[in-house]
């Protein structure tokens, strides 16, 4: 290990788990684990807040085995916008279980009075909601399994319900469930979906839940690319390490949390976490500017032949497109949170997207558009249609999304595979249709009838034809 790889000096052997985390993916390891390692460094009074990881998916086996072999530790490389990187050994993950090997251990951990917070990164799609209504889908195959076989769960809902049942029976006390997923009102979403599942399974437990579990909202932010095999080699060479589970992320990090904890909490404010009574303005700013802009640039950039975000954001045409979207389409609907300079925030976003040392994959941004459009794009689009705003950039985006899903080929003639796992059978029929209007009835757009807006429909149809005839970039050039 190179001398410049930083280590934390707290006594790891004295740290006990006070947090159980579901979903030990790259973002969690670059965000909460980094924050918590910094917290543990502040003093022994925080040693009761180590993290126990719970991995419950079949595909988690490889990374579980690697992390177990590495005693839960790994390197995080923080990539500076100035081109300078800093690497850390992250030690706050002190226990780790995989559901296909350690199911009882995970369930009993939820019932352990030492565990006072359950955190989660289970992705936008993991909350099992119908895209257009937000209804919890009780007819999902895995959900039906967990409803019928509570003691052998396969979903986060099943695990947490059975664990809470044991916690209640053991009189182990109240607990907080804290979503760290990139959803607006993620705590409200968690409360609604977990309540729906538990009410369908055990009404007595549902009554206990209401009085003993809190679900704070939180806003998380740190761009964390997927780590590919070539990244593993590069990071190990750069850091002088032999780490089979490294992660890398940008230098920006933010976490804003509603201060609503049922059984105490770590003093995360010591290391820069912002606590507030209401995270709404922070959520709106981040989801409407960062996430919506990511979606806006993803499909046009990918169709134009770009594969890395930083490369696309060094194309002045795309920068102008994204900045116009931020300034003209989004800013009128985003009140700045207290003590936040919105102009500075937008400029920082442009710099973050262009960070060459992070070099995020555009394919990651394109992934699961069905889950992203309802959260990041549709709320403001509905307001824009209502207010008679210029719809040029958003209609172009939807036309580009259709082209991406339908034709699987970019402007250079290079074919690609799409990755949108939540497309329904009906969605696939609408995409395959030669009637371009049919696409406007795709499941992520069902919160409003886009076809009823003549202005929207006309512009969208024009861009559908233009992208097919001239390509995504040539079409974009005409509107910036």
Tell what function each PLM region has.
Residues 1-480:
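Substrate/ligand-engaging "lid" and interaction regions
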